[in-house]
């Protein structure tokens, strides 16, 4: 049975998703990575003459959701049955995209019919890549030529939808934004580079920089449309059978997901990282092995998209004057900048005392 990796290509109108789906699929197959694509469902509904106008917005998006869900379940089954170690499911939009077009209550109603909710869906995909609409940075290329069903007839409306889509996906475990700072061919190559890095080719590297900042304005963070708070509990264990690893609960209650992570240090900012989802029962079982737990930490993580860059800002219950913010990079010398609203104290990437394990051992409580 193959391990299935679910990757969503999303974004605003005329961002290049359809072309990107074909391009990434071809390139992954060149790398001998079995890939199954799922094309955009909305265009198929519209082609059949079904629209929000003649069906009503709720009924249209409910049917769209059910169509997507059925196809996703079927393609997931097929991917699992493939005779390979890992298979990629590549989506032109995921189940959560329709949330950008309906109210919170409407989405909760039709997702709830299948025992799903926003948080569970957001965490069900392994990576999400947002292709920014050409209406933001490549305005001369915006139009209906590539999609006769495109409904956003102004640049302003297209940018608004782009932000709405980005907002619903903010908080997913791995989100990257591909902007229009280059021509389209290079945009696709930048996307491929991000996808390949996520898949761990040639190695599953994590390159992060971490910064100590002054305690943020929480009210301001909550006002940012592309910001989402995720409660996190993580524990560090060293067991006789599995050695050193980390387990993490991301979210709360029945909306939580559980992840096991093994990291191998390469340099101060570069590590090999191997992550796998685990069940709540596995998480609880690990946590019950108190003799092997070396530290536990709880924090609120604010996932933020600012200036087309994804940041993770962590607020800890034991600090009232400071916090940390991290950014993940593709290379050690990649240029970066921090959001203008954070007040930098200093970079602490290379300071052992600010690693999560050290904080867990100093401040954490079981």
Where are these regions (language model features)?
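NTP-dependent small-molecule kinase module
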Residues: 2, 157, 163-212
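Hydrophobic anchor at the beta1->P-loop junction of P-loop NTPases
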Residues: 9
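Conserved lysine of the Walker
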Residues: 17
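Hydrophobic positions on the alpha1 helix immediately C-terminal to the Walker A/P-loop
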Residues: 20
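Conserved substrate/cofactor phosphate-moiety recognition/catalytic segment
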Residues: 25-67
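Conserved nucleotide-sensing/catalytic segment adjacent to the nucleotide-binding pocket
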Residues: 50-109
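ATP-dependent NMP and nucleoside kinases share a basic, alpha-helical "lid"
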Residues: 91-155, 159
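Phosphate-end processing signature that detects enzymes handling 5′-triphosphorylated RNA
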Residues: 185-186, 192-366
């Amino acid at each position: 049975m193959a391990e299935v990796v679910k990757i969503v290509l999303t974004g605003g109108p005329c961002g290049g998703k359809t072309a990107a789906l074909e391009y990434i699929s071809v390139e992954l197959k060149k790398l001998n990575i079995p890939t199954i694509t799922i094309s955009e469902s909305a265009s198929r509904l519209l082609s059949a003459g079904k629209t929000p106008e003649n069906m009503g917005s709720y009924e249209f998006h409910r049917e769209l959701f059910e169509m997507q869900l059925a196809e996703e379940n079927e393609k997931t089954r097929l991917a699992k049955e493939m005779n390979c170690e890992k298979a990629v499911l590549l989506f032109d939009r995921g189940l959560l995209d329709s949330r950008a077009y309906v109210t919170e209550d409407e989405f909760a109603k039709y997702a709830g019919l299948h025992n799903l909710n926003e948080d569970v869906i957001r965490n069900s995909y392994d990576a999400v890549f947002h292709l920014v609409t050409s209406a933001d940075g490549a305005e001369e290329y915006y139009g209906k030529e590539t999609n006769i069903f495109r409904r956003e007839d102004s640049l302003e409306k297209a940018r608004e939808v782009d932000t709405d889509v980005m907002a619903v996906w903010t908080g997913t475990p791995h989100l990257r934004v591909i902007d229009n700072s280059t021509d389209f061919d290079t945009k696709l190559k930048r996307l491929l580079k991000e996808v390949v890095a996520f898949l761990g080719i040639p190695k599953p590297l994590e390159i992060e920089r971490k910064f100590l900042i002054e305690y943020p304005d929480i009210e301001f963070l909550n006002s940012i449309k592309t910001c989402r708070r995720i409660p996190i509990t993580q524990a560090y264990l060293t067991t006789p059978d599995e050695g050193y690893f980390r387990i993490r609960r991301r979210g709360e209650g029945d909306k939580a997901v559980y992840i096991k992570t093994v990291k191998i240090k390469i340099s101060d900012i570069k590590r090999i990282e191997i992550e796998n989802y685990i069940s709540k029962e596995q998480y609880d079982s690990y946590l019950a092995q108190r003799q092997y737990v070396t530290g536990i930490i709880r924090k609120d993580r604010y996932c933020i998209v600012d200036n087309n860059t994804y940041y993770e800002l962590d607020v800890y219950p034991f600090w009232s004057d400071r916090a940390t913010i991290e950014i993940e990079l593709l290379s050690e010398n990649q240029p970066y900048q921090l959001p203008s609203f954070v007040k930098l104290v200093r970079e602490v990437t290379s300071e052992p005392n600010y690693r999560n394990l050290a904080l867990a051992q100093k401040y954490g409580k079981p």
